[in-house]
Protein backbone atom coordinates (compact mmCIF):
# COMPACT_ATOMS: atom_id res chain seq x y z
CA UNK A 1 0.00 0.00 0.00
CA UNK A 2 1.17 3.53 -0.81
CA UNK A 3 -0.17 6.53 1.11
CA UNK A 4 0.23 10.16 0.06
CA UNK A 5 -0.46 12.80 2.70
CA UNK A 6 -1.47 16.38 1.90
CA UNK A 7 -2.03 19.14 4.38
CA UNK A 8 -0.91 21.85 6.75
CA UNK A 9 0.34 21.87 10.33
CA UNK A 10 -2.50 19.78 11.81
CA UNK A 11 -1.18 16.98 9.60
CA UNK A 12 2.51 17.91 9.62
CA UNK A 13 3.06 18.28 13.39
CA UNK A 14 5.22 21.43 13.61
CA UNK A 15 6.82 20.93 17.03
CA UNK A 16 6.61 17.18 17.55
CA UNK A 17 9.91 15.33 17.70
CA UNK A 18 11.62 13.67 15.96
CA UNK A 19 11.62 16.08 13.05
CA UNK A 20 11.32 14.62 9.55
CA UNK A 21 11.76 17.90 7.63
CA UNK A 22 12.75 21.07 9.45
CA UNK A 23 11.83 23.48 6.64
CA UNK A 24 8.37 21.91 6.36
CA UNK A 25 8.02 21.77 10.16
CA UNK A 26 7.02 18.16 9.67
CA UNK A 27 7.35 15.42 12.30
CA UNK A 28 8.04 11.76 11.76
CA UNK A 29 5.44 11.12 14.48
CA UNK A 30 2.60 12.92 12.73
CA UNK A 31 -0.55 11.03 11.84
CA UNK A 32 0.52 10.17 8.25
CA UNK A 33 3.68 8.48 9.55
CA UNK A 34 1.79 6.70 12.32
CA UNK A 35 -0.87 5.54 9.85
CA UNK A 36 1.73 4.18 7.44
CA UNK A 37 3.47 2.33 10.26
CA UNK A 38 0.20 0.84 11.51
CA UNK A 39 -0.73 -0.39 8.03
CA UNK A 40 2.76 -1.44 6.99
CA UNK A 41 2.44 1.00 4.09
CA UNK A 42 4.87 3.20 2.19
CA UNK A 43 4.38 6.94 2.66
CA UNK A 44 4.90 10.07 0.61
CA UNK A 45 4.41 12.82 3.20
CA UNK A 46 3.89 16.13 1.41
CA UNK A 47 2.48 18.04 4.39
CA UNK A 48 3.92 21.47 5.18
CA UNK A 49 3.06 23.62 8.17
CA UNK A 50 1.50 26.89 7.06
CA UNK A 51 0.02 25.42 3.88
CA UNK A 52 -3.19 26.74 2.40
CA UNK A 53 -5.41 25.07 -0.17
CA UNK A 54 -3.66 27.25 -2.75
CA UNK A 55 -0.22 25.86 -1.89
CA UNK A 56 -1.64 22.37 -2.08
CA UNK A 57 -3.25 22.91 -5.48
CA UNK A 58 -1.24 25.30 -7.62
CA UNK A 59 1.05 27.73 -5.78
CA UNK A 60 4.56 27.19 -4.44
CA UNK A 61 4.83 27.68 -0.68
CA UNK A 62 7.71 30.03 0.11
CA UNK A 63 9.20 29.35 3.53
CA UNK A 64 12.21 31.67 3.35
CA UNK A 65 14.40 33.21 0.64
CA UNK A 66 15.59 30.27 -1.45
CA UNK A 67 13.43 27.76 0.44
CA UNK A 68 10.11 26.76 -1.04
CA UNK A 69 7.91 23.74 -1.65
CA UNK A 70 6.10 23.10 -4.94
CA UNK A 71 2.32 22.61 -4.90
CA UNK A 72 1.75 19.48 -2.83
CA UNK A 73 -0.59 17.89 -5.35
CA UNK A 74 2.29 17.67 -7.84
CA UNK A 75 3.99 15.17 -5.53
CA UNK A 76 1.12 12.68 -5.34
CA UNK A 77 2.35 9.48 -7.00
CA UNK A 78 0.14 8.03 -9.75
CA UNK A 79 0.25 4.70 -7.92
CA UNK A 80 -1.03 6.02 -4.57
CA UNK A 81 -3.67 3.83 -2.95
CA UNK A 82 -4.75 6.37 -0.32
CA UNK A 83 -4.52 10.17 -0.31
CA UNK A 84 -5.27 12.00 2.94
CA UNK A 85 -6.00 15.71 3.28
CA UNK A 86 -6.10 17.97 6.34
CA UNK A 87 -6.06 21.66 5.43
CA UNK A 88 -8.21 24.76 5.35
CA UNK A 89 -7.60 26.17 8.81
CA UNK A 90 -5.04 28.63 7.46
CA UNK A 91 -7.47 29.74 4.76
CA UNK A 92 -9.88 30.70 7.55
CA UNK A 93 -7.01 32.12 9.66
CA UNK A 94 -8.25 29.96 12.54
CA UNK A 95 -5.21 28.99 14.61
CA UNK A 96 -3.17 32.03 13.56
CA UNK A 97 -5.75 34.43 14.95
CA UNK A 98 -6.09 32.31 18.07
CA UNK A 99 -2.32 32.34 18.68
CA UNK A 100 -2.08 36.09 18.08
CA UNK A 101 -4.94 36.77 20.48
CA UNK A 102 -3.33 34.49 23.06
CA UNK A 103 -0.08 36.44 22.94
CA UNK A 104 -1.95 39.74 23.29
CA UNK A 105 -3.73 38.38 26.34
CA UNK A 106 -0.70 36.66 27.86
CA UNK A 107 1.81 39.50 27.44
CA UNK A 108 0.72 42.60 25.50
CA UNK A 109 4.33 43.82 25.40
CA UNK A 110 5.76 40.59 23.96
CA UNK A 111 7.57 40.82 20.64
CA UNK A 112 5.71 37.77 19.34
CA UNK A 113 2.39 39.57 19.48
CA UNK A 114 3.85 42.48 17.54
CA UNK A 115 5.25 40.11 14.91
CA UNK A 116 1.96 38.30 14.43
CA UNK A 117 -0.27 41.35 14.67
CA UNK A 118 0.01 42.61 11.07
CA UNK A 119 -0.97 39.17 9.75
CA UNK A 120 -3.81 38.68 12.21
CA UNK A 121 -5.28 42.07 13.15
CA UNK A 122 -8.42 40.43 14.52
CA UNK A 123 -10.51 37.28 14.60
CA UNK A 124 -12.21 36.85 11.22
CA UNK A 125 -15.90 36.01 11.03
CA UNK A 126 -16.61 33.11 8.64
CA UNK A 127 -19.37 34.42 6.36
CA UNK A 128 -21.32 32.02 4.11
CA UNK A 129 -19.36 33.04 1.01
CA UNK A 130 -16.03 32.24 2.70
CA UNK A 131 -17.28 28.86 3.90
CA UNK A 132 -18.64 28.02 0.46
CA UNK A 133 -15.33 29.01 -1.13
CA UNK A 134 -13.39 26.76 1.25
CA UNK A 135 -15.80 23.88 0.62
CA UNK A 136 -15.24 24.25 -3.10
CA UNK A 137 -11.47 24.34 -2.68
CA UNK A 138 -11.45 21.18 -0.59
CA UNK A 139 -13.54 19.46 -3.26
CA UNK A 140 -11.07 20.69 -5.90
CA UNK A 141 -8.22 19.00 -4.05
CA UNK A 142 -10.18 15.73 -4.10
CA UNK A 143 -10.67 16.07 -7.86
CA UNK A 144 -7.00 16.91 -8.39
CA UNK A 145 -5.87 13.95 -6.26
CA UNK A 146 -8.05 11.59 -8.29
CA UNK A 147 -6.62 13.04 -11.47
CA UNK A 148 -3.09 12.42 -10.21
CA UNK A 149 -3.88 8.91 -8.94
CA UNK A 150 -7.12 7.55 -10.44
CA UNK A 151 -7.24 4.45 -8.25
CA UNK A 152 -6.61 6.28 -4.97
CA UNK A 153 -9.06 6.39 -2.11
CA UNK A 154 -9.20 10.07 -1.13
CA UNK A 155 -9.87 10.71 2.55
CA UNK A 156 -10.73 14.08 4.07
CA UNK A 157 -9.45 14.15 7.65
CA UNK A 158 -10.89 17.13 9.48
CA UNK A 159 -9.42 18.94 12.48
CA UNK A 160 -9.20 17.73 16.04
CA UNK A 161 -11.51 19.77 18.25
CA UNK A 162 -9.51 22.61 19.77
CA UNK A 163 -12.26 24.17 21.89
CA UNK A 164 -14.95 22.01 23.45
CA UNK A 165 -18.12 23.43 25.04
CA UNK A 166 -16.37 24.17 28.32
CA UNK A 167 -12.78 24.60 27.16
CA UNK A 168 -10.60 27.11 28.94
CA UNK A 169 -6.91 27.71 28.43
CA UNK A 170 -4.94 27.33 31.63
CA UNK A 171 -2.59 30.15 30.58
CA UNK A 172 -4.73 32.63 28.65
CA UNK A 173 -7.95 34.26 29.80
CA UNK A 174 -9.77 34.64 26.50
CA UNK A 175 -12.83 36.88 26.58
CA UNK A 176 -16.18 35.12 26.06
CA UNK A 177 -16.62 36.91 22.73
CA UNK A 178 -13.20 35.69 21.59
CA UNK A 179 -14.02 32.10 22.51
CA UNK A 180 -17.30 32.39 20.63
CA UNK A 181 -15.47 33.73 17.57
CA UNK A 182 -12.95 30.88 17.65
CA UNK A 183 -15.74 28.32 17.97
CA UNK A 184 -17.47 29.89 14.96
CA UNK A 185 -14.30 29.35 12.91
CA UNK A 186 -13.99 25.80 14.22
CA UNK A 187 -17.62 25.05 13.30
CA UNK A 188 -17.15 26.58 9.85
CA UNK A 189 -14.12 24.39 9.20
CA UNK A 190 -15.98 21.25 10.24
CA UNK A 191 -18.91 22.19 8.03
CA UNK A 192 -16.68 22.80 5.03
CA UNK A 193 -15.14 19.34 5.39
CA UNK A 194 -18.52 17.71 5.77
CA UNK A 195 -19.97 19.47 2.73
CA UNK A 196 -16.85 18.90 0.62
CA UNK A 197 -17.04 15.16 1.33
CA UNK A 198 -20.69 15.09 0.28
CA UNK A 199 -20.02 17.13 -2.84
CA UNK A 200 -16.94 15.21 -3.98
CA UNK A 201 -17.83 11.72 -2.81
CA UNK A 202 -14.62 11.53 -0.79
CA UNK A 203 -14.54 9.63 2.48
CA UNK A 204 -14.68 11.81 5.59
CA UNK A 205 -12.98 10.77 8.79
CA UNK A 206 -14.50 13.27 11.21
CA UNK A 207 -11.90 13.30 13.96
CA UNK A 208 -13.55 16.50 15.24
CA UNK A 209 -16.54 14.49 16.45
CA UNK A 210 -14.37 11.91 18.18
CA UNK A 211 -12.26 14.49 19.99
CA UNK A 212 -14.89 16.64 21.73
CA UNK A 213 -13.77 15.36 25.12
CA UNK A 214 -10.08 15.90 24.32
CA UNK A 215 -10.02 19.64 23.64
CA UNK A 216 -7.88 22.28 25.32
CA UNK A 217 -8.39 22.17 29.08
CA UNK A 218 -9.71 18.60 29.16
CA UNK A 219 -8.34 15.84 31.37
CA UNK A 220 -6.80 14.12 28.34
CA UNK A 221 -6.12 16.80 25.71
CA UNK A 222 -5.24 15.86 22.14
CA UNK A 223 -4.25 19.44 21.35
CA UNK A 224 -1.71 21.69 23.04
CA UNK A 225 -2.70 24.62 25.18
CA UNK A 226 -1.00 27.97 24.55
CA UNK A 227 2.80 27.58 24.56
CA UNK A 228 4.45 30.86 25.67
CA UNK A 229 7.97 29.77 24.68
CA UNK A 230 8.66 31.69 21.43
CA UNK A 231 10.73 28.78 20.14
CA UNK A 232 7.78 26.40 20.43
CA UNK A 233 4.80 28.69 20.33
CA UNK A 234 3.90 27.58 16.80
CA UNK A 235 2.77 24.32 18.40
CA UNK A 236 0.08 26.12 20.42
CA UNK A 237 -3.43 24.75 19.82
CA UNK A 238 -2.01 21.99 17.59
CA UNK A 239 -2.16 18.20 17.94
CA UNK A 240 -0.11 16.58 20.67
CA UNK A 241 1.64 13.26 20.12
CA UNK A 242 -1.41 11.60 21.69
CA UNK A 243 -3.65 13.53 19.31
CA UNK A 244 -1.68 12.39 16.27
CA UNK A 245 -1.84 8.80 17.53
CA UNK A 246 -5.60 9.10 17.97
CA UNK A 247 -6.09 10.44 14.44
CA UNK A 248 -4.00 7.61 13.01
CA UNK A 249 -6.04 5.06 14.95
CA UNK A 250 -9.31 6.55 13.69
CA UNK A 251 -7.96 6.40 10.15
CA UNK A 252 -6.92 2.77 10.50
CA UNK A 253 -10.48 1.97 11.55
CA UNK A 254 -11.95 4.13 8.80
CA UNK A 255 -9.86 2.53 6.08
CA UNK A 256 -10.87 -1.02 6.97
Residue positions per predicted region:
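Short, solvent-exposed beta-strand-terminating loops
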Residues: 88-105, 158-165, 209-216
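Conserved SGNH/GDSL esterase-like catalytic core that processes O-acyl groups on lipids
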Residues: 2, 19-129, 136
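A structural motif corresponding to the C-terminal end of an alpha-helix
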Residues: 36-43, 130, 136-155, 188-206, ...
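Active-site segments of SGNH/GDSL-like serine hydrolases
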Residues: 121-124, 137-183
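Short, amphipathic alpha-helical "lid/cap" segments that border enzyme active or binding sites
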Residues: 73, 131, 135, 139, ...
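Catalytic His-Asp segment of secreted/periplasmic serine-dependent ester chemistry enzymes
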Residues: 160-256
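Short, hydrophobic/glycine-enriched beta-strand segments
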Residues: 2-8
Amino acid sequence: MLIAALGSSFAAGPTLKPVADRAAMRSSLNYPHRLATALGADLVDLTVSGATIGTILDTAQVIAPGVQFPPQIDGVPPTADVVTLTAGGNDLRFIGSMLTTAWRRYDPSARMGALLGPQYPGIPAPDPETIEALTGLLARVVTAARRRSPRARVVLVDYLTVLGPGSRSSLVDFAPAELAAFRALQDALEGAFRDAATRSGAQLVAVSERSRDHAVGSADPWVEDFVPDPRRTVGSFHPTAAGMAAVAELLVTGLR
